[in-house]
Amino acid sequence: MTRRRRRSSARSNPSAWKADGLMASILLVSGPNLNLLGEREPEIYGRDTLDELVGDARAVAEANGHSLDHVQSNHEGEIVDAVQEARDRCAAIVINPGAFTHYSYALADALAAFEGPKIELHLSNPSAREAWRRTSVVAPVVTGTVAGFGRHGYRLALEAAVTLLKEDG
C-alpha cells in the first residue's frame, strides 16, 4: 500500500507563508521545445532565449519578495513530477506547457491537485493559430491564462501569480 505524505499547512496554504515568515516560492515550468526559444520559429515565438525570459520572471518574483524555481523539460513525466513535487514547496505555478497544452491529461490532473494559483502561459496566441492548437486540456484546471503577449507574457504571468498570492495572504 502506498501512503501519501501529509502536507505541512504552511507549505500547502499560500496564506500561511507570510505568517510563518517564509518567502513564497513560485514554480515556473517550461514545456517541450521551449529550450529552443530564440532559434525556433522566431517570427512566432520571438528572438529571446528561455534564459532571458526566465530572468525576466525571476526579477518580478524577487522584486515582490518571492523566489522562483524553474524547470524545463521535453518529457511529459518530468513535468508532471515537477508539478506534483511543487505541492509541498511552492505557493504558485506559472506554466508554459507547450504542446502538452493540447493533449496532456496527466499534466491537467497534476495541476488540478495543486491548491495554489496556477497560471497557464503562452508566448503566442494559440486561439489565433492552427485549429489543433485551439484546445487546451489545461485551461479548465488553472486560475487563468496569459497568451499572445510574447516576451511580456512571462512578466504578466508572474505579476498575476504575485497578485493572487497577495490576495490570498
Placement of each model-derived feature along the sequence:
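Glycine- and acidic-residue-enriched helix-capping/strand-helix junction motifs
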Residues: L37-D51
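Short acidic/histidine-rich motifs immediately flanking catalytic phosphotransfer sites
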Residues: A86-I93
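Short, acidic/small-residue loops that bind anionic groups at enzyme active sites
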Residues: A112-R129
